[in-house]
Each structure stands twice: as C-alpha cells, then as structure tokens.
Regions:
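N-terminal single-pass transmembrane signal-anchor helix
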Residues: 3-30
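Structural motif detector for alpha-helix initiation sites
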Residues: 9, 73-76, 168
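Low-complexity, S/T/G/P-rich flexible repeat/linker segments used as non-globular hinges
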Residues: 122-178
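Extracellular/periplasmic head regions of type IV pilus-like filament subunits
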Residues: 61-133, 137-139
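Sec-dependent signal peptide cleavage junction
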Residues: 26-42
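Short, compositionally biased strand/turn segments
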Residues: 1-7, 63-66
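Membrane-proximal N-terminal amphipathic helix
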Residues: 38-63
Length: 178
C-alpha cells in the first residue's frame, strides 16, 4: 500500500473553520483598540492644549487673568500649539472652534476648560467644552464625541462655564488674525 502525502478535505475544512473563529474574535478586538487609541489621542491633545495655554498665560503679559465672573478665551490660533495641528485621523483642528477658556471660581482658583474640534469635509470629532478636572479622570476617553455641536461664541461659552449669562465686557478673547 502506498503512503499518501497531503491533507484530507475534512482536515482542510477544520483548519478553515478554526481560522474563521480566530478571525471573528481578533478583528473586533483590534478595531476597539484602535478606536480607544484615537480617543486617547484627543484627550492627550486637549491636555497638551491646556498646558500650552498655561505657558502662554505665564509668558504673555498682555493677557489678563480673569476676575470673578469673567472669562478669558485663548483660541487655538493664539496659543503656541507646538506639534498639535491634526488629530489621529488626519483632521485639522479648527482654529475658531478649538480653544481654552479660563474661569475664575469663587475660591480664587482659575479653572481651565478646553474644547478641541477636529474637522474634515463631512464631520467633526473631538472633545466638547470640558474642564481640566474631567480630562484628568480615567473615564476621559468617554468625553470624545463624533459630530457634536461645538460651543461657540462669547455668550455661549460664558453661559456654559458659569451657568448664567455673562456680560460681553467680562469675556476677553485672544486669537490671531491672518
């Protein structure tokens, strides 16, 4: 009797089924890991923007620290943003919708709030107006949103930070004009 080399049809089918099961398990895990990393990039970039805004506040004497009831808004275009220009998906950060807002609290503490919006032709994605405290939590990646409505305009930003309407004279904006 001659010895046969090779696999039977049953053996080949078994290998294909096993590989299919492995793929069904592996692909969703890889996709969720990539999405989690993209969200972590937004949170990291938002924290970098706050750090750069703090540096800008220390080095630029033209910018006043806010008094109680006031807001200082530093737009992305005004802050020396270093290497933070695009998000992990290649979207450019919007210069008018991305900013850091400083709020003076009742206990003489300056709160930093950030909004970071990456835009392309069809959608936006980023971190809606959020406090530095919230960005420091382990759940910060849950703050990243897709196709959200950014908080824009002095009045809306002031209202979002204080929960009430603030006089336009108490909101100071700093942005570079082209």
């Amino acid at each position: 009797m001659k010895k046969r080399n090779g696999f039977t049809l049953i053996e080949l089918l078994a290998v294909i089924v096993i590989l299919g099961i492995i793929m069904m398990i592996a692909i969703p895990n890889v996709i969720s890991t990539v999405e989690k990393q993209e969200k972590n990039t937004y949170v990291s970039d938002a924290n970098k923007l706050i750090t750069m805004a703090k540096y800008t506040m220390r080095t630029n004497t033209d910018i006043p620290y806010p008094d109680p009831g006031q807001v200082v808004i530093l737009y992305f275009s005004y802050i020396d943003n270093g290497d933070v220009e695009t998000d992990s998906e290649g979207r450019t950060y919007d210069l008018e919708q991305s900013y850091v807002a400083l709020k003076h609290t009742d206990d003489k503490y300056i709160e930093y709030w950030v909004q970071l919006v990456g835009v392309d032709a069809s959608s936006n994605r980023g971190v809606p107006l959020t406090s530095e405290v919230e960005l420091g939590k382990d759940t910060a990646i849950n703050l990243v949103r897709k196709n959200f409505t950014p908080t824009e305009g002095k009045a809306a930003i002031g209202y979002r930070l204080y929960g009430r309407t603030i006089s336009a004279s108490d909101i100071f904006e700093f942005k570079k004009t082209v």
